[in-house]
Amino acid sequence: MDKQEKSLIINEFKKSESDTGSTEVQVALLTARIHQLTTHMIANKHDFHTKRSLLTLVGRRRRLLSYMRNSNGAGYQELIANLGLRK
């Protein structure tokens, strides 16, 4: 993911003008990175280092989504709908 893709994601999910670290932005960035690593893993099945990194990112996203579900239920539902995540 390059700077331009990252800034597009941040602009789409930010709450205010200077927001780059809210939970929504973090989850959106992690989701983009997870999609990127998933396509890499399809082509490179024996890349175990990437597999471990992918599982780490999925766990981090899961913890952030759990926090968001407990603190902001409506925002959680909207975010998973926008990102196309199931639940």
Swiss-Prot record:
<keyword id="KW-0689">Ribosomal protein</keyword>
<comment type="subunit">
    <text>Part of the 30S ribosomal subunit. Forms a bridge to the 50S subunit in the 70S ribosome, contacting the 23S rRNA.</text>
</comment>
<dbReference type="InterPro" id="IPR000589">
    <property type="entry name" value="Ribosomal_uS15"/>
</dbReference>
<comment type="function">
    <text>One of the primary rRNA binding proteins, it binds directly to 16S rRNA where it helps nucleate assembly of the platform of the 30S subunit by binding and bridging several RNA helices of the 16S rRNA.</text>
</comment>
<comment type="similarity">
    <text>Belongs to the universal ribosomal protein uS15 family.</text>
</comment>
<dbReference type="GO" id="GO:0022627">
    <property type="term" value="C:cytosolic small ribosomal subunit"/>
</dbReference>
<keyword id="KW-0694">RNA-binding</keyword>
<comment type="function">
    <text>Forms an intersubunit bridge (bridge B4) with the 23S rRNA of the 50S subunit in the ribosome.</text>
</comment>
<dbReference type="InterPro" id="IPR009068">
    <property type="entry name" value="uS15_NS1_RNA-bd_sf"/>
</dbReference>
<dbReference type="GO" id="GO:0019843">
    <property type="term" value="F:rRNA binding"/>
</dbReference>
<dbReference type="GO" id="GO:0003735">
    <property type="term" value="F:structural constituent of ribosome"/>
</dbReference>
<keyword id="KW-0699">rRNA-binding</keyword>
<keyword id="KW-0687">Ribonucleoprotein</keyword>
<dbReference type="GO" id="GO:0006412">
    <property type="term" value="P:translation"/>
</dbReference>
<dbReference type="InterPro" id="IPR005290">
    <property type="entry name" value="Ribosomal_uS15_bac-type"/>
</dbReference>
<dbReference type="Pfam" id="PF00312">
    <property type="entry name" value="Ribosomal_S15"/>
</dbReference>
<protein>
    <recommendedName>
        <fullName>Small ribosomal subunit protein uS15</fullName>
    </recommendedName>
</protein>
